[in-house]
Amino acid sequence: MTTYSDKGAKPERGRFLHFHSVTFWVGNAKQATSFYCSKMGFEPLAYRGLETGSREVVSHVIKQGKIVFVLSSALNPWNKEMGDHLVKHGDGVKDIAFEVEDCDYIVQKARERGAKIMREPWVEQDKFGKVKFAVLQTYGDTTHTLVEKMNYIGQFLPGYEAPAFMDPLLPKLPKCSLEMIDHIVGNQPDQEMVSASEWYLKNLQFHRFWSVDDTQVHTEYSSLRSIVVANYEESIKMPINEPAPGKKKSQIQEYVDYNGGAGVQHIALKTEDIITAIRHLRERGLEFLSVPSTYYKQLREKLKTAKIKVKENIDALEELKILVDYDEKGYLLQIFTKPVQDRPTLFLEVIQRHNHQGFGAGNFNSLFKAFEEEQNLRGNLTNMETNGVVPGM
């Protein structure tokens, strides 16, 4: 595990502020919205569809804390772009939007360095003000929308209206207290991690924040490599993974196979009270990966000689299957959902940090074993020579 302290020169202009929103392209946005609201504690924020004059695409916007998800679907059978995306990738993340300052400058610099500009800067406005946008191509079919608010005071963005329907079930469910996006992870095919991470360094002036390789993260069967990139202020963190050769197909390779290439593997959501959050998410019916009781037996032994003290009750962490990683300065608590669609692709993480800025490297081996158990149930913990071939295709 390597942590990098050199952030490079501070960009002259074009500051990246934070994650703005994540857009999912799904087959049925209305039903996907219901899942994230009922299972995960999101609430409707805004809507754009036929009733608001949007004739091609419907979008339901949901929010929890500072986390904003946009669930979008095609309205017409001739929408080839969204149709092809769904056939290839299934339901998943299409766009990660960043709120920025000086969108024009960022686009100009990215273009000079060779980035593919999917859509040049444009401005939209309504009675609440103006917003400038631009769209850049990153790994796979994923895009980044740059969002520059020009004194905009609306709830979301121009063109969206308040949702017409509020599900009466939602206020009766326990609060989940998820507060903000901590990081968003992209999986790459083998040998593409470095080029994908370098894209951010070159085009967006991000820097390397953290990395691990397959000598540090491996099981008997599989392994991974990961590089985390971040903006100068380190308010946006983007881990980039790739599979590493092993005896069996890794969970990263399984993702790449079923996603049809690179894409967003998971979104980590930060909380200040993970025990309450996970208890309530489990009560709502969200499914999580399980880890064996031996993990907690070993954890109790290791913590006896650790320089830090975990404030949370270890029995409660074991009951909820929450993982702990730590160093001499602090610790983090984390847990991962099972895939949130039928394809074994996108899943979510809930994380709580106590003076610890890592990504759970100490848990990677335990997690990989948990992932491998799930892979085995799906018939996908196969020999490496079958890599790249999705069963039945």
Curated annotation (Swiss-Prot):
Record-listed E.C. numbers: 1.13.11.27
Catalytic activity reported: 3-(4-hydroxyphenyl)pyruvate + O2 = homogentisate + CO2
Domain VOC: 18-149, 180-338
Cofactor(s) of this protein: Fe cation
Modified residues annotated as N-acetylthreonine in this record: 2
Gene Ontology CC: one annotated term: Golgi membrane
Entry membrane topology: Peripheral membrane protein
Top enzyme category: oxidoreductase
Predominant localisation class: cytoplasm
GO biological process, one term: L-phenylalanine catabolic process
Note describing how the cofactor binds: Binds 1 Fe cation per subunit.
Residue(s) carrying Phosphoserine: 211, 226, 250
Stored CDD domains: HPPD_C_like, HPPD_N_like
UniProt entry keywords in alphabetical sequence: Acetylation, Cytoplasm, Dioxygenase, Disease variant, Endoplasmic reticulum, Golgi apparatus, Intellectual disability, Iron, Membrane, Metal-binding, Oxidoreductase, Phenylalanine catabolism, Phosphoprotein, Repeat, Tyrosine catabolism
Keyword presence, Magnesium: no
Keyword Ribosomal protein in record: no
Compartments reported by the entry: Cytoplasm; Endoplasmic reticulum membrane; Golgi apparatus membrane
Superkingdom per UniProt: Eukaryota
This protein's pathway: Amino-acid degradation; L-phenylalanine degradation; acetoacetate and fumarate from L-phenylalanine: step 3/6
A UniProt-annotated Pfam family: Glyoxalase
Clinical condition linked: Tyrosinemia 3: An inborn error of metabolism characterized by elevations of tyrosine in the blood and urine, seizures and mild intellectual disability. Hawkinsinuria: An inborn error of tyrosine metabolism characterized by failure to thrive, persistent metabolic acidosis, fine and sparse hair, and excretion of the unusual cyclic amino acid metabolite, hawkinsin, in the urine.
Role of this protein: Catalyzes the conversion of 4-hydroxyphenylpyruvic acid to homogentisic acid, one of the steps in tyrosine catabolism.
Name of the protein in its database record: 4-hydroxyphenylpyruvate dioxygenase
Protein's organism: Homo sapiens
GN (gene name): HPD
